[in-house]
Amino acid sequence: MTSLARLKFYATQPHACSYLPDEQATTLFLDPSQPMDVQVYAELSEMGFRRSGDHLYRPHCQRCSACIPARIPVNAPELSRQQKRILKRNADLQVRGVRPAFSEELYALYANYIEKRHADGDMYPPSREQFNTFLVRDLPFSRFYEFRLDGRLLAVAVTDVLPNGLSAVYTFYDPDEERRSLGRYAILWQMGEAARLGLKAVYLGYWIKNCRKMNYKTEYRPIELLVNQRWVTLS
């Protein structure tokens, strides 16, 4: 175990919340001068921290505790009929993990995804600079898992491989392949990959009960939420 007591953290000023209208958010960041050590990252992930670009962060709001860290234990998944159908529907895809690097093919998929799925969000409009800063970080534990059909790129799951699990950083995919449910499939695939690697969980980021865009996270069972500094199974 690493001593976390020596680490420094910084809180932002209140800013508009990306998920809940009319709410102000505060974010706690690990001191960016601290090297991105995989063991520190793993221990902080147990405390609800996430990675964005070169930064580790978690919500630190004074008046709101709606953002609840969520993870899926992978040793005994309880797949629904819909999830089994999604796995079967995508059995023809080939997956490979590569080190993060920019390519026009990747950016075109990302830009199309943002434009068609998140035109109302703070990541719109997409740009190459945004894509590189957010996702293309050459970190030894980070992978781009590419999902292809006969060579055609359909989805990318940006994933950090930690000692305690896989952290699902971001997934983008072809929005025209709606029937495949590629976002949900990427999580199911990550669950299988975590189990194959002998890891205990897939870390999904934050679940917000009153945010419709977050509802999909509780489709995966069992799922654990970090409540009062303890991981508890959602019943």
Curated annotation (Swiss-Prot):
Reaction catalyzed: N-terminal L-glutamyl-[protein] + L-leucyl-tRNA(Leu) = N-terminal L-leucyl-L-glutamyl-[protein] + tRNA(Leu) + H(+); N-terminal L-aspartyl-[protein] + L-leucyl-tRNA(Leu) = N-terminal L-leucyl-L-aspartyl-[protein] + tRNA(Leu) + H(+)
Choose one Gene Ontology CC annotation of this protein and give it: cytoplasm
**The keyword Kinase appears for this protein:** no
Entry EC number(s): 2.3.2.29
Q: Which GO terms describe its biological process?
A: ubiquitin-dependent protein catabolic process via the N-end rule pathway
Localization annotation: Cytoplasm
Keyword entries, A-Z: Acyltransferase, Cytoplasm, Transferase
A GO MF annotation of the entry reads:
arginyl-tRNA--protein transferase activity
* Classification via HAMAP family: Bpt
Protein's UniProt name: Aspartate/glutamate leucyltransferase
**Organism from which the protein derives:** Stutzerimonas stutzeri (strain A1501) (Pseudomonas stutzeri)
